[in-house]
Amino acid sequence: SYEFSDCNENEYQTYVTDHSPQCILNDPLRPDTVSTPVSGNELLEAGEDCDCGAPANPCCDAATCKLRPGAQCAEGLCCDQCRFMKEGTICRMARGDDMDDYCNGISAGCPRNPFHA
């Protein structure tokens, strides 16, 4: 198994914090996933609302990969108990010269602050 050394991990964190490389920080788009949709592989693929991986996720029906009735989301920094967190809730704290990122109230993802350094 390959693991980062403490030194490499610190250098990587510094790079990500200082340069905000979008190719690393952005979630892949659903059409970018190349595999056939498979329930439980923990990848959100075309046609899936959620992919819980384990039947224990209360927001996702593991048999259909669809959100359970009343659920808005199954995972994400802005998803809490199957609901989108309120707009303005901090989902990623500022690092260095960067600014906090906030939930938008309409998605489970944590959008990057457009004014980040």
Swiss-Prot record:
> Which cofactors, if any, are listed as required?
Zn(2+)
Q: Where mainly found?
A: secreted
Query: Which InterPro entries does the record match to this protein?
Result: Disintegrin_CS, Disintegrin_dom, Disintegrin_dom_sf, Peptidase_M12B
* Superkingdom, taxonomy of origin: Eukaryota
Named from the GO MF annotations, one term is: metalloendopeptidase activity
Q: Which residues are in the Disintegrin domain? A: 36-117
Self-association and partners: Monomer.
Q: Which family does it belong to?
A: Belongs to the venom metalloproteinase (M12B) family. P-II subfamily. P-IIa sub-subfamily.
- Further details from the record: The disintegrin belongs to the medium disintegrin subfamily.
Indicate what this protein is called per its UniProt record. Answer: Zinc metalloproteinase/disintegrin
Species: Gloydius halys
